Amino acid sequence: LKKNDFNYSLKNCLKDINQDLVFYGGKNLLSKVIIFFLNISFKLIFWYRISRYRYLKSKMARKALIFIKYRLYVLGGNEIDYRAKLGKEIKFAHPSGVIIGAGVVIEDKVTIFQQTTFGSHGHKDEPKSYPTIKQGAIIYSGAKVIGGITVHENAVIGANSVVLIDVPKNSTAVGIPAKIIE
């Protein structure tokens, strides 16, 4: 990961956080304050954005990431690596047990349910490879999306599926291991 991958300034970070507040229903100052303090889904993406900014800022600032990682874990056992790349309007429908690894890319308007994992294949003799989740995908409860695969636009991953293959655009993958059914 290179420092300029996101070119993520404080201004961009705050802009993204404000867009997240609006996405989660913040229409005015009062509703934004309520969402900021009470909406766990927002807090998950908020802490990710702060950690991403801190990671790209400097080595010294990275020490703050220990605290941020702890906060995410306390908020329902979630772990989002600051090296992952998350787009805008990511919806965490039930933010509990969401694990997102270092090289994962999740594009805009993706919905993620509880107890989902996005990570590398874990083969010790091979370089790590991580999934890419394209715009509009929905990942249901308990799904595991593993390895250097792509879940394409508007694809659906069924509950408790283990996805080890690419999922085509506008299709559904279910099962262990997952098979394409549409």
Model-identified regions with their sequence ranges:
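Left-handed beta-helix
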Residues: 76, 82, 87-88, 93-96, ...
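Terminal amphipathic alpha-helical/low-complexity segments used for targeting or macromolecular assembly
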Residues: 1-76
